């Protein structure tokens, strides 16, 4: 099993990696849809309530999603019944716990809703590392942009962020 804790250089994790769309929905989702269609992307994974809601609302259903059901805007995500399997995990802020990592391992197969008690933000890294070829991982940037990572192009570069995480010990 794998567990990581953000220990330093939090600033690197706030960087808006490509493809960053500084448009409100539905336009932001349309940009990602165009990208997905143009590059024959087969899998889309969303991390975060607002991004997941926008993708579902504007007709771009993700393969699997991770949400914590808490947003600064008080938004409720509709349409989560689309996902056949629900996995509940504990994941404190700044962590990717063993159980969250295991949930992402299942989620990359498709049809999974990960409900996080804590914070889901760091799970984007697990999705980027574990996603199959022709995948995009999408999440919201704290300044309001939609970030979509085509993993085939950026996986190696983004995985260097693991150098700034420390492995954590958890009780089984």
Curated annotation (Swiss-Prot):
UniProt entry tagged with the keyword GTP-binding: yes
InterPro entries: GTP-dep_dephospho-CoA_kin
EC number per UniProt: 2.7.1.237
Pfam families documented for this protein: DUF359
Gene Ontology terms: biological process: coenzyme A biosynthetic process
Catalytic activity: 3'-dephospho-CoA + GTP = GDP + CoA + H(+)
Coiled coil location: none
Sites where the protein binds GTP: 49-51, 68, 70, 120
EC class: transferase
Pathway the protein contributes to: Cofactor biosynthesis; coenzyme A biosynthesis
Keyword annotations of the record: Coenzyme A biosynthesis, GTP-binding, Kinase, Nucleotide-binding, Transferase
GO MF terms, alphabetically ordered: GTP binding; kinase activity
Family per record: Belongs to the GTP-dependent DPCK family.
Function summary: Catalyzes the GTP-dependent phosphorylation of the 3'-hydroxyl group of dephosphocoenzyme A to form coenzyme A (CoA).
Record's protein name: GTP-dependent dephospho-CoA kinase
Species of provenance: Pyrobaculum arsenaticum (strain DSM 13514 / JCM 11321 / PZ6)
């Amino acid at each position: 099993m794998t567990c990581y804790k953000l220990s330093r250089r939090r600033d690197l994790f706030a960087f808006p990696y490509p493809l960053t769309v500084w448009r409100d929905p539905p336009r932001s989702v349309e940009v990602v849809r165009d990208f997905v269609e143009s590059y024959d992307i087969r899998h889309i994974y969303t991390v975060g309530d607002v991004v997941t809601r926008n993708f579902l609302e504007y007709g771009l259903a993700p393969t699997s999603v991770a949400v914590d059901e808490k947003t600064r805007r008080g938004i409720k995500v509709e349409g989560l019944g689309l996902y056949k399997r629900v996995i509940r995990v504990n994941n404190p802020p700044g962590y990717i716990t063993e159980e969250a990592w295991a949930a992402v391992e299942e989620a990359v197969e498709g049809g999974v809703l990960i409900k996080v008690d804590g914070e889901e933000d760091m799970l984007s890294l697990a999705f980027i590392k574990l996603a199959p070829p022709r995948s995009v991982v999408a999440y919201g940037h704290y300044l309001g942009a939609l970030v979509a990572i085509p993993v085939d192009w950026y996986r190696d570069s983004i995985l260097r962020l693991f150098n700034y995480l420390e492995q954590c010990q958890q009780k089984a």
